[in-house]
Each structure stands twice: as structure tokens, then as C-alpha cells.
Amino acid sequence: MLLMNLFTIINNDVPTPYNMYFQDSTTPHQEGILELHDNIMFYMLTVLGLVSWMMIIIIKDYKNNPITYKYIKHGQMIEIIWTILPAIILLMIAFPSFILLYLCDEVISPAMTIKVIGLQWYWKYEYSDFINDNGETIEYESYMIPEELLEEGQLRMLDTDTSIVIPVDTHVRFIVTATDVIHDFAVPSLGIKIDTTPGRLSQVSTLIQREGIFYGQCSELCGAQHSAMPIKIETVKLPTFLTWLNEQ
């Protein structure tokens, strides 16, 4: 048992103090975002290293002999290099980013739809595909739990009294809007960040590939209690989701 515990994977699905990297991904979208970030960082560090090396060489040579390049006015070859090379690097960055941008905006045959409504300062969720025993759409509101009411293990400024419950490995579409001001529905582990605009319906899809609890927050300054709009998503197995659905 101890050996099994040593090899247990503990995913980072919540913000942690002094964390310098992303939360662990749980969707293909976030995997693509992480890969694009790492690729761009590679190009940035390569350019930084190359330019720094050139600057050091130039400063060193000039220090040894200030008049070495006194009469050099231009260099055609170096001008060609510093024009073409950055263009190639930008193209290598642009093409993957355009592809990822297109894929993140594409909504592919969702199995279920959840409507998200942002209000000052809480969220409202509607499961438009399901109705309860009274023939009404399943909907509820989600408020942040005040710090003085938090139980052991709950997270300050992140835990809510209700959460979005989603079956794992299911294509889910979020349709988002707002009733008052612009909010932003953002969950880092899912790679989701989309504005909720009054009078406008926007959509984003996701496929969560593992069970867990994922947190997000409103990421658009929306008023005095902007920080009191956390998002909590629970991903469960399909039988557990159906049981939860029957209880609503």
C-alpha cells in the first residue's frame, strides 16, 4: 500500500502560492495551450541567448579595439539575416497558434449543454437539456462560501455552495451570457476563458478527461465584489452524474 501511495499522481488543480507554472491540464484544449506556451518559450529563449551572445561579442571586440569597424557603414548579408530569420520564427509561432485558436473555438457535437449566466456577484447555471419532475429546466445559483463558514479542506475565495457537475469524458458546451455587466467565465485547468456579455450568447466547448474538482474565477473586473465570483466544477462518472441529476 505504501508503495502504491508513492506512485500516486497528485494533480495540481487549484492555485498555489508562488506557483510559476500552469495548473495541470484536464482537457485537450489546455494540453494544446501548454504545448504552444512551451514552444514559444523555446523560441524566446533561443532568441534571447543568440542576441545576448552577439551583444557580448560586439562589446568585447569594441572594447579591445574601438576603431576596428570605424568605416563600416552597412552589411548586406547581416541585414538579410536579421530580416529573414525573425520572419521565419514568427511564422513558426503563428501557424500553431492559429490552428489552436480555431480548434478552441470549434464546438463539436456536444452531448450536453449548460447555460452560464453571470450576475453581480454570483453565477447561475441552467442544464437546458434536462427537466425535473415538475417539468422545469434544472437551474440553480452558485455563491462563494464566506471565509467564516468554510469547513476543513475548503478553499478560501474558491469554494462555492453549489457547483457545476459534469460527467467525465463527455463533450460539454457552455453557453454564456450576463444580465448586468461583462463578466468572464474562466477555468484554468480546462483551458476556458470567455467573456459573458449582456445581451449576447457566446459558446465554448470542453471535454474533461479525468475526474476531479476544478476551480476558476470571474476574470473580468465587474464591480466591488468581483473577487467573490468563484467557479467550481466537479467531474464525476456517468452513473454518479445521473444520480445527482435525479436528485435535482
Swiss-Prot record:
Q: Which GO terms describe its cellular component?
A: mitochondrial inner membrane; respiratory chain complex IV
Q: Assign the protein's first listed, main location to one coarse class.
A: mitochondrion
According to its UniProt record, this protein's enzyme class is translocase
Q: How does the record classify its membrane topology? A: Multi-pass membrane protein
Enzymatic reactions: 4 Fe(II)-[cytochrome c] + O2 + 8 H(+)(in) = 4 Fe(III)-[cytochrome c] + 2 H2O + 4 H(+)(out)
Q: Which residues cross the membrane?
A: 40-61, 80-104
Which residues are exposed on the Mitochondrial intermembrane face of the membrane? 13-39, 105-248
The protein here is known as Cytochrome c oxidase subunit 2
